[in-house]
């Protein structure tokens, strides 16, 4: 409540009425008209009560408020609210294992529905999914502020959501940070990475993300260790989401499910993949790697797409010869 300000000003269109504006951290979140306090309706930030006429004020800063207790149901409601919207990354800054489990189940269900998004949590490597990122430690800012692992989720979420499809966040610097809150030895760092844990380390006096990875670690012959790298995953997500958008925008309900119609869709898919190759997200794109055939139903189409993602250079093996 301490970040809420209420501004009351005269309404120029309706004489005698006032505009009551609720501001949160400097942003307008609610606006309504009224003559008296009784005319006002409560909103998500302020519960208006009382009687009497309204009076102008440049800004009444509310005091004594608190955030209240966040319940598991609040997180469940949040996930239900955002599900209908398109998004690429969400972060849940909590240490509660039960909430992490609920969020992970939610993200995995979206994956089963064909939506490829990523979730950022702290210390939850057991998710074992390319759709879930787990952050192990936090950072210390130059003014001494401690950003713990649950709070640093916000930075990782922003960095992940803002990364280009052909960009890795490995060694991405945390602006303003001078140290990490928990230091690890090289062996401990290696073990954490193998366990699917993203962490911060200090390199050349910079606090950086040691490696841009997710929690996937149950490798198989069909799904290898490349899936643990977030740049590779972003590329695969872009292929999935981009082709889906292409289909929904230009073909579903519009194109004929004939040889010519499917070939037209195939050509557009190839063009899309070639664009990704042009920005060095993919390599070796050839038409033979894209197959579009008629499905079992008369209105269904089956697409098979083979791609080769390009990862960033992260490992250097060097031999120095002395002569």
Task: List each model region and its residues.
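Composition- and surface-driven signal marking solvent-exposed, interaction-prone regions
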Residues: 103-106, 288, 318-321
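A glycine- and small-residue-enriched flexible loop/hinge signal that marks low-structured segments
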Residues: 1-256, 260, 265, 275-277
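C-terminal structured domain segments
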Residues: 257-298
């Amino acid at each position: 409540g301490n970040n809420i300000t209420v501004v009351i000003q005269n309404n120029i269109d309706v004489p005698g009425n006032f505009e009551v504006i609720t501001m949160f951290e400097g942003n307008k979140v609610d606006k309504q008209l009224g003559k008296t306090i009784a005319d006002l309706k409560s909103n998500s930030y302020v519960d208006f009560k009382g009687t009497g006429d309204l009076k102008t004020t440049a800004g009444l800063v509310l005091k004594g408020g608190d955030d209240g207790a966040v319940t598991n149901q609040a997180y469940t409601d949040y996930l239900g609210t955002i599900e209908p919207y398109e998004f690429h990354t969400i972060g849940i800054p909590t240490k509660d294992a039960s909430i992490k489990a609920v969020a992970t189940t939610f993200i995995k269900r979206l994956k089963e529905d064909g939506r490829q998004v990523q979730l950022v949590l702290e210390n939850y490597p057991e998710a074992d999914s390319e759709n879930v990122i787990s952050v192990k430690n936090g950072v210390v800012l130059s003014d001494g502020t401690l950003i713990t692992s649950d709070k640093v989720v916000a930075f990782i979420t922003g960095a992940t959501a803002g990364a280009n499809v052909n960009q890795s966040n490995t060694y991405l610097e945390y602006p303003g940070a001078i140290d990490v809150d928990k230091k690890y030895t090289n062996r401990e760092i290696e073990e954490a990475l193998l366990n699917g844990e993203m962490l911060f380390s200090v390199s050349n006096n910079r606090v950086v993300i040691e490696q841009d990875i997710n929690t996937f670690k149950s490798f198989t012959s069909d799904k290898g260790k490349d899936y643990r790298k977030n740049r590779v995953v972003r590329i695969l997500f872009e292929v999935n989401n981009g082709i889906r958008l292409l289909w929904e925008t230009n073909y579903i309900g519009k194109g004929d499910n004939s040889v010519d119609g499917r070939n037209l869709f195939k050509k557009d898919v190839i063009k899309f993949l070639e664009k990704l190759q042009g920005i060095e997200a993919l390599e070796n794109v050839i038409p033979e790697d894209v197959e579009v055939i008629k499905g079992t139903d008369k209105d269904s189409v089956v697409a098979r797409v083979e791609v080769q993602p390009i990862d960033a250079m992260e490992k250097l093996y060097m031999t120095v010869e002395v002569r």
